[in-house]
């Protein structure tokens, strides 16, 4: 049982036969899918049952899937990366491996209290900065605003008024100091949201995450959300209060066809978590009939954006936004709904209740899937804890592929912890990334070996008329290993898309291929079988999003032309041709100058270590000729940087060891200079004794007490050893002097 299965307490019936009104029922498929689950249907961890259940789409092979997208008020962090990479992997597997026809919907929450508050904060800070820059603005205009911001109070009306007064004073003094004098929260919040939405989508592109089939923005859905809420009111499951609208949980709960808290009933006790879902600018709880009622429409207060509605100007609550947008695309029956486990309550719980109230149905979503938490050193990411790692920051340390491997090595539904590696206050990496980097290197080296072996046979395409293809025992063993890997991968895919299990099976196949290549003479390799293994590994990695679906062997991600004409060919070949010409010119110049072998070898090393890596080529020197390997230039640069860092550390260690050895030698020589008769009268012995015999051996301690016989015997041994070292020193000094005299 995985960690994700253990973390769900069992709250309700697990199947349709366990209770008169089950919390979840297996989906009733349409005629196109009446035969039940496909033989190869995966079993998904369903948050309704907290168990793995067979996946059965409602409409044959078509899958309607909605996931909660970002609330765009800040930069995306590693927690977002894990969530969206995991859903990208699951989506790719469902589409490319299981061959479902997936309609994938993601929303963008661009109306939210956090965005509104951040927009006001940025405006206020910009005005204070402008006032400070131009100078001469009265303190009576800046001090109240600074005090309000410092207090942490969420009085946006006062904040807006104070900021506007300061803006007017700045404009009166310098009209050019402010570029947007007519700023209003109605437009300002959306400008902020658009900025972070664009950044988020670029982050997703950089991470190799496929775009959704439909993107729904809250700001484009306000009219439909109002209509959606009205239907819920008309059905008797919501009520208006002081211009806001609330969902009536007790009425919904008492209806025979409905159940509230299907996902996590225990979470109802967490009032703080429920209130957090209402937003930072929520109205007084006294407006609600019951404590568990939640807001569908918020009456806007001064300083807050607003849209028209039958209940007065306001804006949608967080939960209703997803219900309305998902329903608009997928309707009253959704195959899969998903998001991070932190959205389980109250967001997804309320989303279900609203939608089932709107359609007056028992079950709106058939499978709820949640990705596991990602923590930093066991703590939730927070700027106040200084453990907030953005996607952009992570991509400066690792490639997108390496980060994806990190997540693939952990089950998507399990919690995950990252341990930062720090130099001072700066995070330079994560301990868990070491396994991901090693995994990537394992696959890269595997593809290099396969393609190198095929090139060595003169049949890079896997076939040559001159190559023998008859199988021997080694080929039969490798064939069995390929079959075993296929079975292992398939079993892992069926088991809740168990990506660690998939990687494990692929690594076992790599081990079998490496064993085959080591056992068979290079000229006797059977290329078709070897190519089959390479293509299978490539295909599965493509399903996981770490390889390109080019039809070839390898991870891909190698730039170059598209083969579409002379221009693209020239553009692709230009860097390599430039390198060849430069190298030829350098070698010719060295030859004409009569350069020695070392200079020519340095030029060759420069091409290997600098020129070729910039083209994405790694050159391995070996007996019988060098072997070239194609790689991502950025990965080669990082590999070179790691090697340089390791070399520098090794050299620094050698330097320290050399200094330490020199220090010890100097100390030893200094001690050897001391005559044995003077040994116990100086240094560490200086204050230990008061009387000595004729040979300088101590006879009495510093208090005048005569030393014991055993103690004197021990000191005599020390003095004898010193005499040997001193005699060596004198002999060496005499020899050195004799050498100088001879010269």
For every predicted segment, state its role.
Residues 3, 8, 49-54, 58-206, ...:
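N-terminal, positively charged nucleic-acid-binding surface of large information/translation enzymes
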Residues 2-30, 389-743:
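Structural preference for alpha-helix termini/caps and helix-kink/transition segments
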Residues 2-73, 87-88, 195, 199-207, ...:
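Alpha-helical recognition segments enriched in aromatics with Gly/Pro capping
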Residues 100-103, 235-242, 615-620:
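Short, well-structured beta-strand/strand-turn elements
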Residues 214-215, 367-372, 621-626:
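Long, charged, glycine-rich C-terminal linkers/tails
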Residues 105-113, 133, 213-225, 243-252:
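Short, glycine/charge-rich beta-strand/loop segments that flank catalytic centers
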Residues 68, 176-183, 300-308, 486-489, ...:
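Short glycine/proline-rich turn/loop motifs
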């Amino acid at each position: 049982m995985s960690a994700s299965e253990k973390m769900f307490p069992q709250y309700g019936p697990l199947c349709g036969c366990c209770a008169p009104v089950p919390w979840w029922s297996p989906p009733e498929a349409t005629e196109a899918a009446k035969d039940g689950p496909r033989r190869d249907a995966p079993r998904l961890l369903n948050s309704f049952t907290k168990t793995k259940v067979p996946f059965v789409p409602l409409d044959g092979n078509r899958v309607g899937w909605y996931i909660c997208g970002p609330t765009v008020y800040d930069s995306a962090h590693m927690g977002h990366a894990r969530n969206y990479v995991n859903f990208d992997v699951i989506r790719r597997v469902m589409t490319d491996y299981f061959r479902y026809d997936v309609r994938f919907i993601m929303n963008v929450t661009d109306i939210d209290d956090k965005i509104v508050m951040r927009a006001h904060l940025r405006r206020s800070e910009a005005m204070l900065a402008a006032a400070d820059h131009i100078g001469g603005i009265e303190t009576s205009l800046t001090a109240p605003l600074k005090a309000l911001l410092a207090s942490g109070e969420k009085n946006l009306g006062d904040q807006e008024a104070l900021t506007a007064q300061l803006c007017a004073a700045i404009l009166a003094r310098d009209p050019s100091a402010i570029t947007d004098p007519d700023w209003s929260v109605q437009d300002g919040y959306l400008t902020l949201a658009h900025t972070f939405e664009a950044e988020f989508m670029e982050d997703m592109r950089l991470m190799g995450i496929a775009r959704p089939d439909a993107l729904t923005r809250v700001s484009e859905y306000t009219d439909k959300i109002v209509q959606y809420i009205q239907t819920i009111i008309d059905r008797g499951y919501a009520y208006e209060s002081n211009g806001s609208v609330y969902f009536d949980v007790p009425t919904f709960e008492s209806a025979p066809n409905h159940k509230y808290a299907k996902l996590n009933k225990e979470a109802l006790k967490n009032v703080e978590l429920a209130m957090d879902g209402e937003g930072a600018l929520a109205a007084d709880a006294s407006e609600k009939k019951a404590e568990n009622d939640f807001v569908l429409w918020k009456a806007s207060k001064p300083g807050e954006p607003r849209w028209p509605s039958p209940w007065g100007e306001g804006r949608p609550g967080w939960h209703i936004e997803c219900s309305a947008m998902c329903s608009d695309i997928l309707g009253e029956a959704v195959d899969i709904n998903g998001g991070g486990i932190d959205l389980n309550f109250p967001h997804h719980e309320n989303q279900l209740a609203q939608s089932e109230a709107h359609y007056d149905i028992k079950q709106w979503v058939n499978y709820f899937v949640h990705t596991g938490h990602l923590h930093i050193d066991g703590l939730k990411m927070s700027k106040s804890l200084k453990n907030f790692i953005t996607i952009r920051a992570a991509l400066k340390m690792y490639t997108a592929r390496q980060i994806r491997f990190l997540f693939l090595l952990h089950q998507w539904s399990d919690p995950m912890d990252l341990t930062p590696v720090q130099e001072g206050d700066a995070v330079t990496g994560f301990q868990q990334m070491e396994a991901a980097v090693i995994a990537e290197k394992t696959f890269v080296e595997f593809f290099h070996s396969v393609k190198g072996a095929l090139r060595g046979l003169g049949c890079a395409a896997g076939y040559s008329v001159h190559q023998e293809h008859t199988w021997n025992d080694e080929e039969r063993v490798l064939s069995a290993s390929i079959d075993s890997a296929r079975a292992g991968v398939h079993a892992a895919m069926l088991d809740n898309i168990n990506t660690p299990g998939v990687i494990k099976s692929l690594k076992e196949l790599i081990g079998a291929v490496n064993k085959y290549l080591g056992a068979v003479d290079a000229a006797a390799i059977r290329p078709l079988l070897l190519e089959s293994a390479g293509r299978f590994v490539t295909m599965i990695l493509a399903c996981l999003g770490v390889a390109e679906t080019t039809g070839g062997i390898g991870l891909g991600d190698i730039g170059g032309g598209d083969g579409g004409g002379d221009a693209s060919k020239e553009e692709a070949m230009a860097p390599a041709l430039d390198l060849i010409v430069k190298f030829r010119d350098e070698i010719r110049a060295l030859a004409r100058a009569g350069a020695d072998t070392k200079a020519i070898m340095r030029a060759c090393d420069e091409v290997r270590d600098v020129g070729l890596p910039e083209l994405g080529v790694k050159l391995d020197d070996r007996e019988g000729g060098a072997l070239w390997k194609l790689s991502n230039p950025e990965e080669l640069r990082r590999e070179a940087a790691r090697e340089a860092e390791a070399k520098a550390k090794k050299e620094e260690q050698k330097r320290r060891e050399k200094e330490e050895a020199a220090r010890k030698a100097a100390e030893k020589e200094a001690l050897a200079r001391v005559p044995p008769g003077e040994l116990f009268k100086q240094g560490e012995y200086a204050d230990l004794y008061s009387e000595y015999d004729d040979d300088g051996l101590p006879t009495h301690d510093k208090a005048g007490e005569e030393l014991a016989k055993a103690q004197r015997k021990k000191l005599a041994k020390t003095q004898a050893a010193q005499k040997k070292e001193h005699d060596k020193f004198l002999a060496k000094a005499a020899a050195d002097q004799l050498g100088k005299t001879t010269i």
